[in-house]
A protein has these predicted regions:
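Structured, hydrophobic secondary-structure cores that serve as assembly/anchoring elements
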Residues: 1-275
Length: 275
């Protein structure tokens, strides 16, 4: 993972006073133009600096067609950050601290999401085990869920969110830095943090799909936001085909003759009830 220690722990980092901050900020900026880069998701795994994760969310919101998957500070310190043993690097009171820190940021965006805690994965090439930020598992689950069903199906639960060997992340997830109780899961979910839970029979499972939108609405769910991103992209492509054409009934009919079948297809595949 990225060595976050090269970034100071204050919130005063800028492109001009920290080379690492500038490097990552520039990398994020390379995908800010939707006409230049096609994507539907953005993440910088392992980077927990609040200014940079906010930049990820801002880029996704400004584009209006991507979901940002961010990591949060205080969950776990990898060996690149701390030479102490594993138990010391896992902060005993981290859950409450992470929840409090996220609430203090006053985020309210349906274009972002976050997960807890870190996961242990097995390198498929070397067989070695390593700890990875939760965004890594989440991204894999999004991809496998979309491949197995549709982008508007929730990438969570035992069917589409199972992370244990052969599971949804696309690579074996063998452990977590912290096993969550039912009360822990409730605390995280109320703070719009998606828990990665461990169950005796089912193993390790992503057990939530909230966005970082605090305002209650359908868009506080990941699958709804991804549905809207999908529809917006497809409708935009249809609309581009009639750009600058005459504003007459024949043009409107050309648009609806393509848009209606698209929406009907989404409805048939359980993405919409009506349109």
């Amino acid at each position: 993972p990225f060595r976050d220690g090269v970034l100071t722990k204050t919130t005063t980092q800028t492109e001009t006073n920290n080379y690492a901050f500038n490097t990552i900020a520039k990398a994020i900026n390379t995908v800010k133009d939707p006409e230049f880069v096609e994507m539907n998701m953005l993440s910088v795994p392992g980077v927990v600096n609040e200014n940079l994760t906010q930049k990820v969310l801002n880029v996704c919101e400004d584009r209006g067609d991507a979901l940002g998957v961010i990591d949060l500070r205080g969950i776990y310190q990898p060996f690149t950050e701390n030479a102490n043993d594993f138990k010391t690097r896992v902060q005993a009171t981290s859950l409450d601290g992470v929840v409090s820190a996220l609430r203090d940021r006053s985020l309210n965006s349906s274009y972002g999401c976050a997960y807890y805690p870190w996961v242990q994965i097995q390198d498929t090439l070397t067989g070695q085990f390593l700890w990875a930020p939760p965004s890594v598992a989440a991204i894999g689950t999004f991809a496998s869920s979309e491949r197995a069903s549709e982008v508007w199906f929730a990438p969570t639960g035992f069917n589409r969110g199972g992370l244990s060997k052969g599971g949804a992340a696309g690579l074996p997830v063998t452990a977590v830095t912290e096993k969550l109780t039912s009360a822990d899961r409730d605390t995280l979910y109320e703070a719009n943090i998606n828990p990665i839970a461990t169950f005796p029979s089912e193993g390790i499972v992503i057990f939530g799909q909230k966005t970082l939108q605090v305002t209650p609405s359908a868009l506080d769910r990941i699958n709804v936001r991804r549905l809207m991103i999908f529809i917006k992209k497809e409708i935009s492509r249809i609309a581009a085909g009639i750009l600058f054409d005459q504003n007459v009934r024949a043009t409107w009919q050309r648009f609806t003759s393509q848009a209606n079948p698209l929406l009907a297809s989404v409805k048939a595949r359980m993405g919409l009830t009506e349109f």
